């Protein structure tokens, strides 16, 4: 059926078609946000710790036990023990005869370690020399493994909110930490240079070197090839000194100089660079493999404690097992190693000719992050091997004694002390944080830290913290600066100030850290895709210009003539789910290499795949996600989203928004759009958890965001739903925490809106009284009365009731209700312990305890009253402050001692000098508290809670704070939470200022957020419009009550006789160098004399006028004597600070003699 001419005209008519609609993207990108919470369900934040630990429990521990599965006696080789299977059980504790399951909350309260037994099934030979018999035992416990909370072996794994509440656990608590002896410990993420990769660098003298840190299951070694004075040498710790590299190549069987030159490259510049090294080799008289091996043999370090000499010579075995240890040597065929050295030499000479070819050690692609699973795996392997060697020693010891050998049972030797060694080793390392693994010469300190529970967000930030392997003392800017490669992987804001600035980093919101993938299938896949094996290549063919080397995890597999096709094929396979989702493929045009990586510890993040700039994720996919029929893993499986690591990002062109490039229709933008390979899921995910709390951070000056990251961790609020059941040493809680009126997407994702740490305060920005200079805040007394900024401080006190070896024990007595101590005991209950709910004052007794006088002598009968002495414990607190006994808990520790824990509660209202801060790094102390009657008020009768000085804005440039005030004001007036996510205006995750202003005008306020205020003192209108509205303020943990301190006289230090330091020791306040300079400038000489000597450490000395040295006063002769002149004729007495006298004597001990010249005053 044909159309009429008229209809045809209509269809051809341009007005009929909405061209804009056709050219617009399928649907705006604002809807992709839903992917972020879906991603956080399966990956990211704390999940990397859990994934890593789960990998160790499910895979790593089996590999370790399998690798060391059989141990044989050295005395009788037919006696052996074999491990068949290993598994980690449920967390439990062994009471006298029963096994009791435990949960994390119990462990926190009772100071236990949250650990599970490690079971093994064993097969072994037992019996005497004559009749040996095979036997098998199942479920033998070899030790206890501390369990990470929320991991696959944890009680909390997979539980819903109701079940978690039943176990006394907070559903918002992220897990990812261990409980060791009742304290929560986090194994920090460790940052390291990647293993098995060639890194080209230069030393201080400018010598170029190529280094490879090889790491295999068996050995870890570092190989350095360095160029010195145009000659190239190898440095390896087993050789005495540097060794010419050509000799090493000849020792590995590459005898022909021509082949060596071909292998590095035919370019004349390359051969010219190698010439001095080849000449040196000839001058040493080394031409054949045998001569080279003999030369190396002489250079091997002699090891005093002896491994027996290998049959094929030590030099060859070092080259095989330690030199580039990760490159395999099948049947003593060193060809692969030679080629590897060739590639290293080529890269070095390229770097020498062109400095751009050097590697950057701070580039994130050259870094690996070590997570808890890997660290515990190293530790467990070390302890397991120690246990096996101990078992063999025990067996040999028994077999050498014929009487005991007849009743011999191998499995008994395993149980003897071994299970304690593994349990204790793991517990001690996690408790102290000191990793000492002797086999790999690994000694690191501070690997674990106590999880600080100051605020909910503080503990979240703590778990995503990355600890550097770099000395903080070195003042280098390189590793500290913000690298472009950190985009999207590490948070650009969240780093501490001070010495560790830029070294300690935090993960961004959508970063994932990879775990290990199997290499075997990948290798096979590469060969199937047309990689030519190294074995069949000649040295000449290694660097043909049109083909690239293929390197998998630092191993050279071979060459490929169509590298781009190879890389794209691997990517297609990855998107189809045929190879692991975290495998990365990266072509490096400069180095003519294709790198394939599947190793552990790379940082990667998910991105939406785009075809010619158009996103693969369409509206219907997001609809399915919202309906719950599609998960994040489905997006990956269907090839809509993929994970890219830092190296592969270099091959991609990533757009922030799908519409990028379409706004300007010039040719450049169109071309860029056509080349776009990926689109960001959400731009605000480049920030971490802590920086995500800041509203409108992209409107603030950068260091302000960094300051807020540090202060947000110190803000008081709620720490968890179970906070009132916890027994923490110190707990700060806000009485009325609120949700921020101006919120961000991150706040909702993390759960900060449920456990906030601050309050929405109505702030007027104006000068008021003189008490608001330098960021101080003027506070409204009525607001404080209504509970603004009020907080609770809870402290734990522990008392022990001990049992002693001589069958005696402490006893707790009924308190005296009359008598001299009755007043101090009035808070005690009839059981001799403080009653919950009682008000406790300083010097009150909280436990009426008595201790046996003699705890050594054995007693058979009960002790009489006279054999006990009182050991009451008194409460120490700030004078004049009353506190409340909140809870009393009784529990027993490992040794069965009774442990009594008290929680003391103290409610504090804000006072002068307490520290507050907004979410924009603007901290200030309370300068004065003023009655509400004197405060200014608006025409609606609104009175501000705080008054802030306007001078805080110009130099700080925190425009985000101004927008927050407007947004919160609009939110209050229209009853909707407004959003201020980073970079969110374009995607709808941040309200624009225009729309906020429009809302304000609609609700009857000024569009600029300013109000007409009346003075509370005179009642007249204030002569300027005042910027007023709600801002979210945080109360920080720094409070005057904890810091305020002064003293008259008090304790002194023995050595210098000066007052001690610090509030806890009742110390003095030091007049330091700057204060001294200030007093000198004033010319207040008597004050200097009084402060620095009379009130500090005056000391009377006898000085000899003849020699100027110190003498002493002889009390027998009743006169002063000079030790040097041996008489007392010419001695004067004077006052010196004791520290000065000490300095003189210390100098004299170093042969420096200070002499005092005296004149009459």
Curated annotation (Swiss-Prot):
Zn finger (C4-type) start-end: 1104-1125
Origin superkingdom: Eukaryota
EC number: 2.7.7.6
Chief localization: nucleus
Places the protein is found: Nucleus
Keyword field contains Metal-binding: yes
Keyword Zinc part of the UniProt annotation: yes
CDD domains in UniProt: RNA_pol_B_RPB2
Effect of disrupting the coding gene: Defect in seed production due to female gametophyte developmental arrest.
Catalytic activity: RNA(n) + a ribonucleoside 5'-triphosphate = RNA(n+1) + diphosphate
An annotated GO cellular component: mitochondrion
GO molecular function terms noted in the UniProt entry: DNA binding; DNA-directed RNA polymerase activity; ribonucleoside binding; zinc ion binding
GO-annotated biological processes: DNA-templated transcription; megagametogenesis
Keywords, alphabetical: DNA-directed RNA polymerase, Metal-binding, Nucleotidyltransferase, Nucleus, Transcription, Transferase, Zinc, Zinc-finger
Annotated InterPro entries: DNA-dir_RNA_pol_su2, DNA-dir_RNAP_su2_dom, DNA-dir_RNAP_su2_hyb_sf, RNA_pol_bsu_CS, RNA_pol_bsu_protrusion, RNA_pol_Rpb2_2, RNA_pol_Rpb2_2_sf, RNA_pol_Rpb2_3
Transmembrane spans: none
Function: DNA-dependent RNA polymerase catalyzes the transcription of DNA into RNA using the four ribonucleoside triphosphates as substrates. Second largest core component of RNA polymerase III which synthesizes small RNAs, such as 5S rRNA and tRNAs. Proposed to contribute to the polymerase catalytic activity and forms the polymerase active center together with the largest subunit. Pol III is composed of mobile elements and NRPC2 is part of the core element with the central large cleft and probably a clamp element that moves to open and close the cleft. Essential for the completion of the three rounds of mitosis in female megaspores required for the development of mature gametophytes.
Family note: Belongs to the RNA polymerase beta chain family.
Quaternary structure annotation from Swiss-Prot or TrEMBL: Component of the RNA polymerase III (Pol III) complex consisting of 17 subunits.
Protein name (record): DNA-directed RNA polymerase III subunit 2
Native source species: Arabidopsis thaliana
């Amino acid at each position: 059926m044909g159309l009429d001419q008229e209809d045809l005209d209509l269809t051809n008519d341009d007005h009929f078609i909405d061209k804009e609609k056709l050219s617009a993207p399928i649907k705006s990108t604002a809807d992709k946000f839903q992917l972020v919470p879906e991603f956080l369900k399966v990956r990211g934040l704390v999940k990397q710790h859990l994934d890593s630990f789960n990998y160790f429990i499910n895979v790593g521990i089996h590999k370790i036990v399998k690798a060391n599965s059989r141990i044989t006696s050295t005395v009788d080789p037919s006696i052996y023990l074999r491990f068949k299977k290993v598994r980690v059980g449920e967390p439990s504790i062994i009471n006298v005869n029963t096994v009791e399951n435990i949960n994390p909350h119990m462990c926190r309260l009772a100071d236990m370690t949250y650990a599970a037994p490690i079971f093994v099934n064993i097969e072994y030979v037992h019996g005497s020399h004559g009749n040996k018999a095979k036997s098998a035992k199942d479920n033998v416990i070899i030790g206890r493994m501390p369990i990470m909370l929320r991991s696959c072996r944890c009680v909390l794994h997979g539980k819903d909110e109701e079940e978690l509440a039943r176990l006394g656990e907070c559903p918002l608590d992220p897990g990812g930490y261990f409980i060791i002896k009742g304290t929560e410990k986090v194994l920090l993420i460790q940052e390291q240079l990647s293993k098995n990769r060639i890194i080209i660098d230069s030393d201080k003298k400018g010598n170029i070197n190529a280094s490879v840190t090889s790491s295999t299951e068996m050995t870890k070694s570092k190989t350095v090839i360095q160029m010195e004075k145009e000659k190239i040498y190898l440095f390896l710790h087993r050789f005495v000194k540097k060794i010419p590299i050509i000799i090493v190549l000849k020792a590995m069987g590459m005898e022909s100089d021509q082949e060596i030159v071909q292998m590095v490259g035919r370019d004349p510049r390359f051969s010219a660079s190698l010439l001095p090294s080849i000449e040196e080799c000839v001058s040493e008289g080394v031409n054949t493999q045998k001569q080279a091996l003999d030369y190396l043999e002489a250079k091997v370090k002699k090891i005093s404690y002896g491994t027996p000499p290998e049959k094929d010579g030590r030099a060859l075995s070092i080259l095989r097992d330690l030199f580039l240890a990760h490159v395999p040597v099948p049947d003593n065929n060193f060809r692969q190693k030679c080629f590897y050295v060739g590639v290293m030499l080529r890269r070095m000479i390229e770097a020498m000719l062109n400095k751009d070819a050097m590697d950057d050690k701070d580039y994130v692609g050259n870094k690996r992050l070590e997570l808890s699973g890997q660290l515990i795996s190293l530790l467990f392997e070390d302890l397991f091997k120690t246990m096996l060697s101990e078992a063999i020693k025990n067996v040999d010891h028994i077999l050498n004694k014929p009487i005991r050998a007849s009743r011999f049972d191998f499995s008994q030797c395993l149980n003897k002390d071994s299970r304690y060694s593994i349990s204790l080793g793991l517990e001690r390392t996690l408790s102290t944080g000191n990793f000492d693994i002797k086999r790999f010469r690994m000694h690191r300190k501070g690997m674990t830290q106590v999880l600080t529970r100051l605020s909910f967000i503080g503990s979240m930030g703590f778990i995503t913290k990355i600890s550097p392997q770099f000395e903080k003392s070195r003042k280098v800017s390189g590793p500290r600066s913000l690298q472009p490669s950190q985009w999207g992987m590490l948070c650009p804001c969240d780093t501490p100030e001070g010495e560790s600035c830029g070294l300690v980093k935090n993960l961004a919101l959508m970063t994932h850290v990879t775990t290990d993938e199997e290499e075997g299938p990948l290798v096979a896949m590469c060969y199937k895709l047309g990689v030519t094996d190294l074995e069949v290549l000649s040295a000449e063919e290694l660097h043909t210009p049109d083909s690239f080397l293929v390197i998998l995890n630092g191993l050279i597999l071979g060459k490929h003539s169509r590298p781009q096709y190879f890389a794209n094929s691997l990517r297609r396979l990855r998107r189809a789910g045929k190879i692991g989702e975290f495998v990365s493929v990266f072509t490096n045009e400069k180095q003519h290499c294709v790198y394939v990586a599947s190793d552990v510890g790379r940082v990667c993040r998910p991105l939406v795949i785009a075809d010619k700039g158009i996103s693969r994720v369409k509206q219907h996919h997001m609809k399915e996600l919202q309906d719950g029929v599609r998960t994040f893993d489905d997006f990956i499986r269907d090839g809509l989203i993929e994970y890219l690591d830092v190296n592969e990002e270099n091959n991609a062109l990533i757009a922030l928004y799908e519409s990028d490039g379409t706004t300007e229709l010039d040719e450049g933008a169109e071309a860029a759009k056509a080349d776009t390979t990926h689109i960001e899921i959400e731009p605000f995910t480049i920030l971490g958890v802590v920086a995500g709390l800041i509203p409108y951070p992209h409107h603030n000056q950068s260091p302000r965001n960094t300051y807020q990251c540090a202060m947000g961790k110190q803000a008081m609020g709620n720490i968890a739903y179970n906070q009132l059941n916890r027994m923490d040493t110190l707990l700060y809680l806000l009485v009325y925490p609120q949700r921020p009126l101006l919120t961000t997407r991150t706040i909702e994702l993390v759960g900060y809106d449920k456990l906030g740490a601050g309050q929405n305060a109505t702030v007027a920005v104006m000068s008021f009284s003189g008490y608001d200079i330098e960021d101080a805040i003027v506070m409204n007394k009525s607001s404080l009365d209504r509970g603004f900024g009020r907080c609770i401080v809870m402290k734990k006190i522990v008392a022990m009731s001990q049992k002693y070896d001589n069958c005696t024990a402490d006893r707790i007595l009924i308190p005296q209700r009359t008598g001299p101590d009755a007043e101090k005991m009035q808070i005690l209950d009839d059981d001799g312990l403080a009653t919950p709910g009682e008000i406790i004052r300083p010097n009150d007794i909280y436990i009426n305890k008595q201790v046996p006088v003699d705890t050594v002598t054995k007693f058979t009968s009960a002790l009489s009253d006279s054999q006990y002495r009182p050991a009451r414990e008194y409460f120490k607190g700030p004078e004049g402050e009353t506190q409340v006994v909140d809870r009393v808990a009784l529990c027993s520790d490992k040794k069965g001692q009774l442990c009594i824990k008290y929680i003391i509660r103290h409610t504090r209202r804000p006072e002068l000098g307490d520290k507050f801060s907004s979410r924009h790094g603007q901290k200030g102390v309370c300068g004065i508290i003023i009655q509400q009657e004197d405060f200014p008020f608006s025409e609606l009768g609104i009175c501000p809670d705080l008054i802030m000085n306007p001078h805080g804005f110009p130099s700080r440039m925190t425009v985000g704070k101004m927008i927050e005030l407007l947004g919160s004001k609009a939110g209050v007036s229209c009853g909707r939470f407004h959003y201020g996510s980073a970079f969110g205006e374009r995607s709808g995750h941040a309200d624009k200022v225009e729309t906020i202003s429009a809302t304000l005008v609609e609700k009857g306020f000024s569009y600029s957020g300013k109000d007409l205020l009346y003075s509370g003192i005179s009642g007249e209108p204030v002569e300027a419009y005042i910027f007023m509205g709600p801002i979210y303020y945080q109360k920080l943990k720094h409070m005057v009550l904890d810091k305020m301190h002064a003293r008259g006289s008090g304790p002194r230090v023995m050595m210098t006789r000066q007052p001690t330091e610090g509030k806890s020791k009742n110390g003095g306040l030091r007049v330091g160098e700057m204060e001294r300079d200030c007093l000198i400038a004033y010319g207040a000489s008597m004050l200097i004399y009084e402060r620095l000597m009379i009130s500090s450490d005056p000391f009377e000395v006898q000085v000899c006028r003849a020699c100027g040295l110190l003498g002493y006063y002889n009390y027998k002769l009743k006169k002063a004597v000079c030790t040097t002149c041996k008489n007392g004729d010419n001695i004067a007495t004077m006052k010196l600070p004791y520290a000065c006298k000490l300095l003189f004597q210390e100098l004299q001990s170093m042969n420096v003699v200070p002499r005092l010249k005296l004149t009459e005053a």
